[in-house]
A protein has these predicted regions:
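Short amphipathic alpha-helix that is part of the acyltransferase structural core
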Residues: 2-60, 65, 87, 160-197, ...
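Tryptophan-centric aromatic hotspots in well-structured domains and transmembrane helices
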Residues: 43-47, 69-71, 128, 143-145, ...
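A short helix-loop-beta-strand connector motif used in the catalytic cores of GNAT acetyltransferases and
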Residues: 47-61, 67, 121-122, 203-214
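Conserved beta-strand in the GNAT
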Residues: 56-58, 64-74, 87, 215, ...
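Acyl-donor binding region in acyl/amide transferases
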Residues: 77-148, 234-261
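Alpha-helical membrane-targeting segments
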Residues: 139-164
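Long, well-ordered mid-to-C-terminal structural blocks that present hydrophobic/aromatic surfaces
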Residues: 202-250, 254-255
Length: 261
């Protein structure tokens, strides 16, 4: 009896292995030709060195990675419990494998395999999908729009001179930063845990983006507030992005000093 392999049976879904990486990188290059080419170092920086771990699920055809669903986890304090929120990134299907499968297609099947493997590990999965992916996500994966993000822009004002103390640049995060975050988090329902490992990975040792971490100090030298400015986040002359802000809600005078240019 002659047996043929159906198109669906061609694919194996599993976690990424070390020997898959070259193929994964090549498929990513084909799927995102407008993006900067990611190399092995960039992959490990994004998905292996993350102190919260990694979530990489691939669809393999033969020895070739032809689809992928990936998320970057982040440890989050939710109430009194630490959980993981995951930012979905680098979800893709090789151009030569996007046709010929009935709905739900290879993208959805890869995502379903991802959630079968990792779904119970995380409290939230979120992202900013392109329009086509958003339609698929809402139809097959039960994604919902939480809100539309806005870009808030303002001019920096002059120093009010109302608060005492210094603003200095930090080059590393000590335990005092974590203690400041814990003070702030008491009033927040959910907040990324800003420990030294996270801040080092996210800001201080980022290989391709420049961040300036500013600390507001009290007159006795203790840490009162912190903000992070992204130098390369916004493509506009003279513009900078405020990418993190740690100031206790009941200490507005610290916020005034942190806003000083």
């Amino acid at each position: 009896m002659l047996m043929t392999m159906t198109e669906e049976a061609r694919y194996v879904f599993r976690e990424l292995r070390a020997e898959d990486l070259d193929s994964w990188l090549e498929t990513r290059r084909l799927c995102f030709p407008e993006d900067a080419v990611m190399d092995e170092e960039g992959f490990h920086r994004a998905h292996t060195l993350n102190p919260a771990g990694g979530r990489v699920l691939v669809g393999v055809c033969g020895e070739e990675v032809v689809s992928s669903y990936v998320a970057q986890p982040m440890r989050v304090r939710l109430g009194t419990e630490d959980v993981y929120f995951c930012h979905v990134v680098d979800s893709m299907v090789h151009p030569e494998h996007r046709k010929g499968l009935k709905n739900p297609g290879l993208f959805v099947r890869t995502a379903q395999a991802f959630f079968d493997r990792f779904g119970d590990m995380d409290a939230v999965h979120y992202g900013w999908p392109v329009e086509r992916a958003q339609r698929i996500d809402r139809r097959f994966l039960e994604y919902k729009v939480v809100r539309e993000e806005l870009a808030l822009v303002c001019e920096l004002g002059p120093d009010s001179g109302a608060a005492e103390g210094d603003v200095v640049e930090l080059t590393e995060a000590g335990p005092e930063v974590f203690a400041l975050w814990e003070r702030c988090a008491l009033r927040w329902e959910a907040s990324a845990v800003r420990d030294a490992d996270y801040l080092r990975w996210r800001f201080f040792e980022h290989p391709s983006r420049r961040y300036t971490v500013l600390a507001a100090l009290a007159t006795d030298g203790s840490l009162e507030g912190l903000c992070v400015v992204g130098e390369d986040e916004i493509q506009a002359e003279g513009a900078r992005a405020l990418v993190d802000w740690l100031v206790p809600a009941d200490e507005p005078e610290v916020a005034a000093r942190a806003r000083t240019p």
